[in-house]
Curated annotation (Swiss-Prot):
4'-phosphopantetheine is transferred from CoA to a specific serine of apo-DCP. The keyword Nuclease does not apply. Its main location: cytoplasm. Keywords: Cell wall biogenesis/degradation, Cytoplasm, Phosphopantetheine, Phosphoprotein. SUPFAM superfamilies: ACP-like. The keyword Cell wall biogenesis/degradation applies. PROSITE patterns: CARRIER (PS50075). This is D-alanyl carrier protein. Belongs to the DltC family. Residues 1-78 form the Carrier domain. It is found in: Cytoplasm. Pathway: Cell wall biogenesis; lipoteichoic acid biosynthesis.
Length: 78
């Protein structure tokens, strides 16, 4: 599975909706799909499944607002 699809799969599992796959520009926090607990879960899943460590200091809610933005941020950390 390609990197992009892996990230979207993780997001779909955490948000419990395929809306994140259908609309990769959806505002995850504004729509209530991600909150602080789900964000922690997301970072753990990214580290476990993609072997990418995201330092908490690197997490900026504005830069991680949409699935598309998350993919871009993670590609930069690979």
């Amino acid at each position: 599975m390609a990197f992009r699809e892996n990230v979207l799969e993780i997001l779909e599992e955490i948000t419990e909706t395929d809306e994140v796959v259908q609309n990769t520009n959806i505002k995850l926090f504004d729509e209530g799909l991600l909150d602080s607990m789900a964000t922690v879960q997301l970072l753990i899943e990214i580290e476990e499944r993609l072997d990418i460590t995201v330092p908490v200091s690197e997490f900026d809610r504005d830069e991680w607002a949409t699935p598309e933005m998350i993919i871009t941020q993670l590609e930069a950390l690979k």
